[in-house]
Amino acid sequence: MSLPEKAFPVSWDQFHRDARALAWRLAGTNGRWQAIVCITRGGLVPAAVIARELGIRLIETVCIASYHDYSEQGELKVLKEISPSLLEEDGQNILIVDDLTDTGKTAAIVRAMMPKAHFATVYAKPKGRPLVDTFVTEVSQDTWIYFPWDLGFSYQKPIADGEIG
């Protein structure tokens, strides 16, 4: 798989710095969050960093699959729902975390589940930007972000796809 013309490879160090920067921004909002709901899988890593930095102990997940072949967004499917107890009060005092908002389709589904929650992503593209309350870096819509969990020295298919190496 070759990198697209506008590739943005992100190292583990850079992602950690950006996730901590997001935590700093969130700390400045004076939010008193009782829990984080992270959108899996991309939200897992920033949620762990943010939970540590802000002292949040409860992390819940919602799983919405959108990238089925690592290149294009497909049909959105909710694979795991949010715990009903966190849906009370429409997500008031809940922090939703993801790595990226791209088209905003995933964000819109989660926002509909928790309209009063605070939505934070590390990166935002213009189409998804209106659905996010806090983010760190905006990238152009035609940029493909390569996250460190997708990369070795080059893009690596997941082991489950049958190729090791």
Swiss-Prot record:
UniProt catalytic activity: GMP + diphosphate = guanine + 5-phospho-alpha-D-ribose 1-diphosphate; XMP + diphosphate = xanthine + 5-phospho-alpha-D-ribose 1-diphosphate; IMP + diphosphate = hypoxanthine + 5-phospho-alpha-D-ribose 1-diphosphate
Pathway, per record: Purine metabolism; GMP biosynthesis via salvage pathway; GMP from guanine: step 1/1; Purine metabolism; XMP biosynthesis via salvage pathway; XMP from xanthine: step 1/1
Subcellular location(s) per record: Cell inner membrane
Cofactor(s) of this protein: Mg(2+)
Residues annotated as binding Mg(2+): 99
UniProt: 5-phospho-alpha-D-ribose 1-diphosphate binding residues: 41-42, 98-106
E.C. number: 2.4.2.-, 2.4.2.22
Gene Ontology terms: biological process: GMP salvage; purine ribonucleoside salvage; XMP salvage
Membrane topology according to the record: Peripheral membrane protein
Family matches, as InterPro entries: PRibTrfase_dom (IPR000836), PRTase-like (IPR029057), Xanthine_Guanine_PRibTrfase (IPR023747)
Keywords attached to this entry: Cell inner membrane, Cell membrane, Glycosyltransferase, Magnesium, Membrane, Metal-binding, Purine salvage, Transferase
GO cellular component, as recorded: plasma membrane
GO molecular function: guanine phosphoribosyltransferase activity; hypoxanthine phosphoribosyltransferase activity; magnesium ion binding; xanthine phosphoribosyltransferase activity
Residues given in the record as guanine binding sites: 102, 145
Chain positions recorded as GMP binding sites: 102-106, 144-145
Pfam families reported in the protein's UniProt record: Pribosyltran
Binding site for xanthine: 102, 145
HAMAP family: XGPRT (MF_01903)
UniProt xrefs under NCBIfam families: PRK09177.1
Oligomer and partners: Homotetramer.
Role of this protein: Purine salvage pathway enzyme that catalyzes the transfer of the ribosyl-5-phosphate group from 5-phospho-alpha-D-ribose 1-diphosphate (PRPP) to the N9 position of the 6-oxopurines guanine and xanthine to form the corresponding ribonucleotides GMP (guanosine 5'-monophosphate) and XMP (xanthosine 5'-monophosphate), with the release of PPi. To a lesser extent, also acts on hypoxanthine.
Family the entry assigns: Belongs to the purine/pyrimidine phosphoribosyltransferase family. XGPT subfamily.
Protein name per Swiss-Prot or TrEMBL: Xanthine-guanine phosphoribosyltransferase
Species the sequence originates in: Chelativorans sp. (strain BNC1)
Native organism taxonomy: Bacteria, Pseudomonadati, Pseudomonadota, Alphaproteobacteria, Hyphomicrobiales
